[in-house]
């Protein structure tokens, strides 16, 4: 069995407010990825500042933190073969205008400042983000009954 990796996916306040949570979760499930953790929360400013620490010197950073704090988010951990890379492909480009139809951003959003979803950009980032948003005991380990139908 090939190596299973994990990624962090967060549905942003605009995705929650627009009622897109179910559609997004469905896409990851239909692809064959396994949900390991999920929580619905209003993220604290401290958590968001730490999450986006790499962007702190960018001019849009304060607005990004304010926007992410403006409403609830759905934080998730997904697991599967190449889930980081494949998950990013499923999301589409950061700027929805550059996203292809069939991707989450290509289908559901218009502007970069309201692009409805975040996904880890590397395995290393995923590990950092997962540990920031979830305690180890919140990650549920189980074997999906569909596992043998998805993986050789």
Curated annotation (Swiss-Prot):
Q: What does UniProt note about where in the body, tissue by tissue, this protein is expressed?
A: Ubiquitous.
Alphabetical GO biological process terms: CTP biosynthetic process; GTP biosynthetic process; integrin-mediated signaling pathway; nucleoside triphosphate biosynthetic process; positive regulation of DNA-templated transcription; positive regulation of transcription by RNA polymerase II; UTP biosynthetic process
| Entry binding sites for ATP | 12, 60, 88, 94, 105, 115
Region of interest (Interaction with AKAP13), ranges: 1-66
What Gene Ontology cellular component terms go with this record? cell periphery; cytoplasm; lamellipodium; nucleus; ruffle
Gene3D superfamilies the record matches: Nucleoside diphosphate kinase-like domain
Localisation per UniProt entry:
Cytoplasm; Cell projection, Lamellipodium; Cell projection, Ruffle; Nucleus
Answer whether the UniProt record assigns the keyword Iron to this protein. no
Q: Which residues form a coiled coil?
A: none
Q: Which cofactors does this protein require?
A: Mg(2+)
Q: Which Pfam family, just one, is annotated for this protein?
A: NDK
* Record's keyword terms, sorted: ATP-binding, Cell projection, Cytoplasm, DNA-binding, Kinase, Magnesium, Metal-binding, Nucleotide metabolism, Nucleotide-binding, Nucleus, Transcription, Transcription regulation, Transferase
Q: Identify the EC number(s).
A: 2.7.4.6, 2.7.13.3
Q: Where is the active site?
A: 118 (pros-phosphohistidine intermediate)
Principal location listed in the UniProt entry: cytoplasm
The cross-references to CDD domains, in alphabetical order and at most eight, read: NDPk_I (cd04413)
Q: Kindly state the subunit structure of this protein.
A: Hexamer of two different chains: A and B (A6, A5B, A4B2, A3B3, A2B4, AB5, B6). Interacts with CAPN8. Interacts with AKAP13. Interacts with ITGB1BP1 (via C-terminal domain region). Interacts with BCL2L10.
What the protein does comes down to: Major role in the synthesis of nucleoside triphosphates other than ATP. The ATP gamma phosphate is transferred to the NDP beta phosphate via a ping-pong mechanism, using a phosphorylated active-site intermediate. Negatively regulates Rho activity by interacting with AKAP13/LBC. Acts as a transcriptional activator of the MYC gene; binds DNA non-specifically. Binds to both single-stranded guanine- and cytosine-rich strands within the nuclease hypersensitive element (NHE) III(1) region of the MYC gene promoter. Does not bind to duplex NHE III(1).
Family of this protein: Belongs to the NDK family.
What name does the UniProt record give this protein?
Nucleoside diphosphate kinase B
List the gene name.
NME2
């Amino acid at each position: 069995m090939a190596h299973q990796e994990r990624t962090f996916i967060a549905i942003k306040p605009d995705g929650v407010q627009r009622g897109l949570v179910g559609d997004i979760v469905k896409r990851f499930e239909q692809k064959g990825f396994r949900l390991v953790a999920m929580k619905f929360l209003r993220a604290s400013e401290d958590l968001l500042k730490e999450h986006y620490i790499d962007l702190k010197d960018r001019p849009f950073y304060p607005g990004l933190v304010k926007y992410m704090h403006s409403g609830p988010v759905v934080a998730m951990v997904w697991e599967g073969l190449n889930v980081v890379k494949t998950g990013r492909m499923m999301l589409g480009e950061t700027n929805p205008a550059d996203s292809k139809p069939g991707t989450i951003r290509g289908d559901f959003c218009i502007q970069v400042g309201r692009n409805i979803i975040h996904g880890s950009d590397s395995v290393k980032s995923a590990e950092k983000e997962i540990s920031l948003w979830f305690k180890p005991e919140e990650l549920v380990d189980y074997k999906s009954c569909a596992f043998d139908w998805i993986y050789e």
